Amino acid sequence: MPTTREQILQALLARLETIPGATAKREAPLPETVPVGGLIVLRDGDPGEPEMLVSPPTYLWQHKAEIEVIVSRGAGDANTALDGLLMAVGQALEADRSLGGLADWLDWGAPKTHDLAIDGAAGLKGAVVPVTIHYASTNPLG
């Protein structure tokens, strides 16, 4: 059975996969082309150092992950497309902040936007959304 951490990351990816038109992946390299509906890449991030309760042994995590949201600058207004996709990400996360009961709480911060220049790629516009996943496990491996 996967660790609590892995189950949570899989559930978070499943939430992102519910966004209509977009393609969601986990730990994928940045592409040369982006699907028409945009690309969402979940980066596993860092679980950090947990707080520990001793009886029974419980590890309290504040796992920092990132969600990269990328659109093509080709057709239409990339800023509007990126904003729309970011809103859809927010709605998908808001719909289930406990990820089916696996996490205590899911919180995210403001996106940091940037233009992407990848060799051989059309112009891309992206944003990184920091996500903090609060959860408990009985094992220090997550």
Which sequence ranges carry the predicted segments?
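Charged, amphipathic alpha-helical segments and their flanking helix caps
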Residues: 1-36, 45-142
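Generic preference for hydrophobic
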Residues: 41-42
